[in-house]
């Protein structure tokens, strides 16, 4: 995600910190993410910008095999005295307890990249995922008019996944209904697992006699 989008987060943080002579806030960042290379890079961008603004940052990465849950990570960050929690949830549907605890402790919550639905979110920074899906689907159908298509929809617990998929299918679905395109794979990938995605795609290709 471009640095200019990350800068939106710090505009919010500056508002939270108040006037120039007010103490700078401590920021907690909780990544409940998979194996994508983007996350360590974005962690670096956030920490670099926070340092430039004189802010203290504590970051937690929470993957599927972590001994602690993301909720535990967030509770510990909140209890450490942060002013703002930047939350990239693994499962946006299970973030309500985190939001409630943050509100109780008067900690502002910024939902980043993955939308969290709830009245206790103070700010969301991300893209219009549905429109991105529309662009992907349109580009695909401009280049491919017929044949076999495999779609991996991402993690079903990420609100971005169905939005991206639904946007893309606006252009793809008519070709499927006409029989021009045949869907040989159309499944979610739990936890955005790279290994699982490889296995699913390999199995689909083999079952379809390597025709894709």
What residue ranges belong to the model's regions?
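A residue-level marker of the well-folded mature domains of exported/periplasmic proteins
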Residues: 19-212
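Bacterial N-terminal signal peptides
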Residues: 7-15
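Bacterial N-terminal signal peptides that target proteins for export
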Residues: 1-6
